[in-house]
Structures are given as structure tokens and as C-alpha cells.
Amino acid sequence: RRPSTLDPEALGFMCGLEIHQQLSTGKLHSRMPSKLFDIGIDEIPTDWQRRERRLRASQGESGRIDVAARFEAKRKRSFVYVQSPNSGLIELDEAPPLSHDKEAVDAALTISAMMNAKPLPYLQAMRKTVVDGSNTSGFQRTTLISTKGSIETPAGSVGIDVICLEEDSARKLDTQSTNSGEVVIYTLDRLGVPLIEIATAPDVKTPEHAKETALALGMLLRDTRMVRRGLGSIRQDLNVSLACGDRVEIKGCQDLDWIPQIIRLEMARQIHMFLLANELREEAGLPPLPSDRRDDNKPIENRVSRAAISRIPMVLHDVTNQFTNSHSTMIERSLASGSSVIATILPGFSGR
């Protein structure tokens, strides 16, 4: 079926939004100005210093190393940080962070009041592991400001689960392949710029309602006159699920007009994967997936998992030679840096 003809209500559609908006205040944990420099890799002034680093994954408070962090560490990339005039020792992770910028906190509390959210009595910065190089410290600082708010839209009220203040990441300028591995170059002008993060409840009724909700949130933020304007200053992340699928987060939607179509394409993808899974299960003589994943039967799914392991041998083959004439820049760079292309056979899939 065409994505435009799908009925959200009949399919058990659920959707929520996460809005990330830059504030027009100073940086969140340093007293540096939040100025962005419109320069590319070939325009960096010669007097801007550079620092080269490597990041290594370490145990968090749980005593375990994050899976994503371990994966990034295995890539053995190095990072070069260009020190812009509005970055200092804190941005370089060579000095401890300062307390929250007062104007940024005031903006977050103002936005909370406009959404009837309930502020927390204390502000406690939390740390989220980030080892892709976009944070010199290896983590992003996030502070929960308020909870349990709401915003009115043409299709009804949408709950606001949380409002947070967090640091924006460093801005990537280039990725280069060298004999010793991949080198990623960042500029520190954007690192530490305060972001207001607003996460809605899954109260969005339709793909079109998602656009209306994003528009209402954007207009409310602009009314504060405390937010930055322009391309890249706001980002919408979409959380979408159907009864027959899993929740999927679609990151970085910049254009509001794209939101309904992006969501409908994700709905169609989840339906396609559901039908394909049941087609493969039928061929293997296995029970089908229920149309509502909340009705999943754990013993049955364990049986399906064991059957899949026995049917798919997961024998790996090096097919790097088949990609030596690829026109993909990403593949060319990867092969030049010593990477390989690995493939496995999926019996019974027939190219599906």
C-alpha cells in the first residue's frame, strides 16, 4: 500500500517528538560567547591552535563499558580539535566546567512556565557517554529542568515529558584517511552552546499532527526571544512505532514540511518488515509474529531465534576485491585506510 493511504489509528500508530533548540546565551558551562564561525576546513586561520586526541572507552557508573563506546573505540580514530576564539580550557577538557549559565537556566525556566511544566528543586548535571569525538571530554552534560508539561495544538493537547538543558557538540569540518588511520577534524566554536531539549509524550495522533506539534513548539520557543535562528539552530527527532513494529528514532529532521512524509515512509517500512518476517517464518514452518507486538510470546520468540541461528550459518567472507572499483567516496576512503568489506550468505532470503 502507498504510504499516503495508511490509517494511523488502525495500525496502532504512536509518535513523540524531541526538539533540540540552540539558545542565544553564553555557553552552558563556560563563560565563553556562543558565537559560530562560518568557516570550512580550508579557511581556518593560521593562528587558531590545534590539538590532537584519541578517546578510549571506560567503565561508567554501572561498572560496564557502553556497547556503542566500545565499538567507537575499536575504530581507533584520532581527532583534531581546532581552537576557535570562543573556546578555552573548558572546551579543551583541560579545566573543570563552571556552573550553569544563568541566562540559559532562565530561558529554560521561562519555557517550562509557558508549557505549565513543573521545575525540579535542584539542578544536577548528568553525563552521557559520547566517543565519536564530538565532545572532547568523551561525554555530553545534560541537566533535567522540568517535567509534566503540555502544549496546545490544533488537534489537541500534547504532553511534555521532560525539558532539559544540554551542551551542543563540536562541529565536524572534515574526515581524512591516513596511513595510521582515520582522522576527524572538529572546530570547538559550537561545543558547549546551550540546547533546550523538549521531549513530548507519545500523544501525536497522525503524521500531520506531528508537523503541527513541531510548529507549535517552534513558535513557542521563538516567542521567548532567547533562542537562535537560522539553519541548524533547531532539530526535530521523531519517535515512531506501529503495533506490529518497534519504536524507531528518526534523527535530524530540519524541514517541518518533510515530517509527515518521513513518518509515513517509516510506517510503510515497518509494515513491510512485519510482512517479510512472517513470510520467512511461514517458509520455515515457524509461528507468525502477532499483529500487536505487545502480544509477543517469549518462548515462541526464543524458538524462532534458535531456528534462525541454525538456518543462517554466519560464515564470513572477505569480498573487498569486488569493491575496488566502487564509485562511493565512503567506500574508497575506507579501503584506502585499510578497511575490508565482509559479507555473509543468508540462505532462503532470495535477495529479499
Regions found by a protein language model. Give the residues of each.
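Basic, nucleic-acid-interacting segments
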Residues: 1-352
